[in-house]
Amino acid sequence: MQHPHRCPECDGTIRETDTEHVCADCGLVVTDAPIDHGPEWRTFSDDPDHAPERTGAPLTRSRHDRGLSTEIGYSARLTGRKRRKFARLRRQHKRATIPSKADYNRIYGFTEIRRLIGTFGIGTGLRDQACTLFASAQTAGLLHGRTIEGFAAAGVYATCRTNGVTRTLDEIAAAARATRPELTTAYDAMNRDLGLPTGPIDPREYLPRYADALSLPARIERQARELVAALETDGLVAGRNPSGVAAGCLYTAATETDHAVTQSAAAAVADVTPVTLRATYQNLTDA
């Protein structure tokens, strides 16, 4: 068994310094250049308030290269000739960073996903999942003949569906740069070819948001949950719009407790027609 403080060549004594371990007898350098885990003392930025650091941004799946690429910075201290030189270098560097049309499309799709995620205030974890889903669809060749915007919106919608975040197709389509048919076509392709773990949406997931939009108290929401459970027991939820079921149960609960909520207001919150809402209301009142 080799002793940690003995030379592996001559079994001599190891002399330790700040930067290396050297054998005192034969001069063999056993280890050198250890990792310095201490702080950085120098700054490489023109900003005097910038914290001295060598590390960049953390790795993220919301960037086409996971954030590993570098950038050529700007400086006001350069002369005109050097400024033009670095402008050319920056242009060539950007071309090298995006070598293919597929990378360019991925950058555009990820940018659209980040915009949609910011619009709905969804967390960065779901953002990374949506970007990963978009990249998987691109790798599988699903984007051929379809719009990038549609798949970006479909990635956000699919991520919301698989994580229990209640966002309807119409809500996503209203904020996206894709039409609703483009979104549904892309989502159907993802669901079919990628095998998304999506199941039926529980109408109860919509109740907190709809109750807040209609300014209804918590007890109305609790009563609406009981009405949803009653519809499920009678088998009247399967095959119906879960958003409309949630709005219908809230409207019914509000009506039974004399809260002033109109059918049109409840339908508008759920983005359904009053006819859809009345169907749920009729099922509950006939029960």
From Swiss-Prot:
Membership in a protein family: Belongs to the TFIIB family.
Stored InterPro entries: Cyclin-like_sf, TFIIB, TFIIB_arc, TFIIB_cyclin, Znf_TFIIB
Molecular-function GO terms, alphabetical: DNA-binding transcription factor activity; TBP-class protein binding; zinc ion binding
Residues given in the record as Zn(2+) binding sites: 7, 10, 23, 26
GO cellular component: transcription preinitiation complex
Region (Disordered) residue spans: 40-63
Organism of this sequence: Halobacterium salinarum (strain ATCC 700922 / JCM 11081 / NRC-1) (Halobacterium halobium)
Source organism superkingdom: Archaea
TFIIB-type ZnF: 3-31
The name this protein goes by in its record: Transcription initiation factor IIB 1
Sequence repeat feature ranges: 111-194, 205-286
TM region positions: none
Lineage of origin: Archaea, Methanobacteriati, Methanobacteriota, Stenosarchaea group, Halobacteria
One Pfam family hit: Zn_Ribbon_TF
Keyword Zinc-finger: yes
Task performed by this protein: Stabilizes TBP binding to an archaeal box-A promoter. Also responsible for recruiting RNA polymerase II to the pre-initiation complex (DNA-TBP-TFIIB).
Coiled coil: none
Listed Basic and acidic residues bias regions: 40-53
